[in-house]
């Protein structure tokens, strides 16, 4: 008789323990119920990027002196700088500058170490294409400034910082 009683007590304790675990899980679920949704409707709503966001690189052809510092500091030797030496003025003349964003890791070293500040990071992050060769940008494509997310009237911008209610 006692083994049956101890099994019944163990069964009761296990039932109470299981109910407690289910209750704890339910309380965690309820604590998340009052939060705002994190997902956004992407093509119609976009997050405003942070101030120091590292997006597509912008290049100013007139400022570049073809020193190739950007190539030396890049961990994957990505920027392609073509230049020729002008013997009469003893300076390099930049012919072509290109970056393949299919390979770029957006580390920002090229922007940080550029002595003439001809490179800068933009807030553009939509670089998807159907052909990877379209991600190879030359100096003309790199010189294009993107449309700011805030200035685009066709979409609703959402700040990624939490909303603080006054009052």
UniProtKB/Swiss-Prot annotation:
Known cofactor(s): [4Fe-4S] cluster
Family: Belongs to the complex I 23 kDa subunit family.
UniProt entry keywords in alphabetical sequence: 4Fe-4S, Chloroplast, Iron, Iron-sulfur, Membrane, Metal-binding, NAD, NADP, Plastid, Plastoquinone, Quinone, Repeat, Thylakoid, Translocase
Compartments where found: Plastid, Chloroplast thylakoid membrane
Lineage: superkingdom: Eukaryota
Cofactor note: Binds 2 [4Fe-4S] clusters per subunit.
Domain 4Fe-4S ferredoxin-type: 55-84, 95-124
Function: NDH shuttles electrons from NAD(P)H:plastoquinone, via FMN and iron-sulfur (Fe-S) centers, to quinones in the photosynthetic chain and possibly in a chloroplast respiratory chain. The immediate electron acceptor for the enzyme in this species is believed to be plastoquinone. Couples the redox reaction to proton translocation, and thus conserves the redox energy in a proton gradient.
Native source species: Coffea arabica (Arabian coffee)
Annotated protein name in UniProt: NAD(P)H-quinone oxidoreductase subunit I, chloroplastic
GO MF terms held by the record: 4 iron, 4 sulfur cluster binding; iron ion binding; NADH dehydrogenase (ubiquinone) activity; quinone binding
Pfam family, any one: Fer4_10
Subunit and partners: NDH is composed of at least 16 different subunits, 5 of which are encoded in the nucleus.
Residues the record lists as binding [4Fe-4S] cluster 1: 64, 67, 70, 114
